[in-house]
Amino acid sequence: LPGVLGFKPSVLLLTTGYALGYGMMGLSGAELLLSVSFFLVGIAKGSAMNACTILVSGNSADRTRGMNLMHSCYACGALLCPFLIAAAARVSTELAVFLLAAMGLVLWLVYVFTPLHGGKSKSSTEKEAIDWSFLWSARFWLLTGLLFFQNAAEQSVNGWMVTYFKGSGIIAGTLAAYTVTVMWGATLVGRLLIAFVFPFKKPRKAMVGMSVLCTVFYVLLVMAHTQGAAIALLFAFAISMSGLNPTAVASAGRMTSVTSMGIMLPVASSGAILMPWTIGMVAERAGLAAGMASNIVPCVGLSLIHISEPT
């Protein structure tokens, strides 16, 4: 799309999905309309992530620090926004949804008044020539595979851990609902530490270490039988994985473009769709404990990817 409309017009067009999607959710509960609304919100989210990735990558002297700082902002929003929306929902569900629509409109206005450039030498409206050379890069596909497994492992824990903890009785009551808060809190802490306190001098070795640690902590997590151990291991798992996504994207280096990110991020995000679905299928046949155990596969995949990655 940027090759036809230009970078900024493309971003402005696609990010309207936040305001439109959430606005439609607040106005109607019709199933078809809700499906369209969620689709628009998903398009807007993908566009915003792609745009921010391109902008940060193209304007950062240290890509790894820049990407971790950007993803820290993402984690901060994911940590705090649910509390704001929950407070609004106490008044009415419609108010909560319209508040999300208003936030989407604010984001769109930020893009309107911000000079957007698809790179250091590209104007915001310039129609970019598409370079497909990254498709023949083994490093590009290995990084995409790494992100695929990271998304699969992380979103499976986000989506299923509350159900698993409640069903197994490991964490009872309202505390189980705050496990996602623990994850996002750990993620925020980890990314800020990488950005400002412990910057990576050798990103590849750092990613290997993070991959191994998140695998170890996940194995221990599914073996936990007490509330304290489960919370501590969940925090450790999340903080060990926190820097993988931004560091992997930053490692794309010169391959970072509107087109390459438009392929890398959606392909990687499919892991967040397939693995939670797989856990559900396994859980139906063998129980939720077996389903959660199957999430060890993408965790191990993170480590195996590095064996094939060129140095």
Task: Name these PLM-found stretches.
Residues 38-72:
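Cytoplasmic helix-loop-helix junction between adjacent transmembrane helices
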Residues 1-6, 190-202, 283:
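Helix-to-loop junctions at the C-terminal end of transmembrane segments
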Residues 138-181:
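Extracytoplasmic gate region of multi-pass secondary transporters
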Residues 69-116:
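Helix-loop-helix hairpin linking two adjacent transmembrane segments in secondary transporters
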Residues 6, 27-32, 61, 224-225:
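Helix-breaking motifs and short loop linkers at transmembrane-helix boundaries and internal kinks
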Residues 1-26:
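Conserved MFS/SLC helix-loop-helix module at the cytosolic interface between two early adjacent transmembrane helices
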Residues 303-311:
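Residue-level detector of conserved catalytic or cofactor/ligand-binding positions
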Residues 204-248:
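C-terminal transmembrane helical hairpin of 12-TM major facilitator-type secondary transporters
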